[in-house]
Amino acid sequence: MALILPCTFCTSLQKKNFPINRRYITNFRRGATTATCEFRIPVEVSTPSDRGSLVVPSHKVTVHDRQRGVVHEFEVPEDQYILHSAESQNISLPFACRHGCCTSCAVRVKSGELRQPQALGISAELKSQGYALLCVGFPTSDLEVETQDEDEVYWLQFGRYFARGPIERDDYALELAMGDE
């Protein structure tokens, strides 16, 4: 049975003008909870039960966009990413990778809770301090967040590892590395 359901990974590639033929999950069986898209990426699938349709709770999400000086308020179902839901409502929020690997969509949670199991771009330490990624975040309650500067979050996470003082140029080492003696 072919299920016409957009795969977020494939949709993201298409938005970046990556040529793909289909954007849909095609190998879905009745009662299954997972399927795969054309790139063989596992995708969670929820379907209505035979007793009636599944009702997914929605939550009010308020985003204070510091860079643009605006406040966005919108509803997000618990089973949708906050960034994707905002975009479907014509709300522009900062992002880059859409897969939880960078810190472009990083926010600081002011109130409420969210679930972000795929947020690889943010450490457990920063998550415990209230940082989150909108591109892979699902609201679990009404939520109020504030956007952060990407460099600020990146520095908090990686700065202590790379900040060892200025880098001195070594032309001789550069010549050796390039094979020019």
Curated annotation (Swiss-Prot):
[2Fe-2S] cluster binds at C97, C102, C105, C135. Its cofactor is [2Fe-2S] cluster. SUPFAM superfamilies: 2Fe-2S ferredoxin-like. One of its GO terms (cellular component) is chloroplast. GO terms for biological process: electron transport chain. Residues 1-44 form a transit peptide. Induction: Slightly up-regulated in response to acceptor limitation at photosystem I (PSI) in plants lacking of photosynthetic [2Fe-2S] ferredoxin (Fd). GO terms for molecular function: 2 iron, 2 sulfur cluster binding; electron transfer activity; metal ion binding. The keyword Transcription regulation does not apply. It is found in: Plastid, Chloroplast. Residues 59-151 form the 2Fe-2S ferredoxin-type domain. Binds 1 [2Fe-2S] cluster. InterPro entries: 2Fe-2S_ferredoxin-like_sf (IPR036010), 2Fe-2S_ferredoxin-type (IPR001041), Beta-grasp_dom_sf (IPR012675), Fd_pln (IPR010241). It comes from the Eukaryota. Pfam families: Fer2. Keywords: 2Fe-2S, Chloroplast, Electron transport, Iron, Iron-sulfur, Metal-binding, Plastid, Transit peptide, Transport. The keyword Plastid applies. Gene3D superfamilies: 3.10.20.30. Ferredoxins are iron-sulfur proteins that transfer electrons in a wide variety of metabolic reactions. Mediates alternative electron partitioning in conditions of acceptor limitation at photosystem I. Belongs to the 2Fe2S plant-type ferredoxin family. This is Ferredoxin C 2, chloroplastic. It comes from Arabidopsis thaliana. The gene is FDC2.
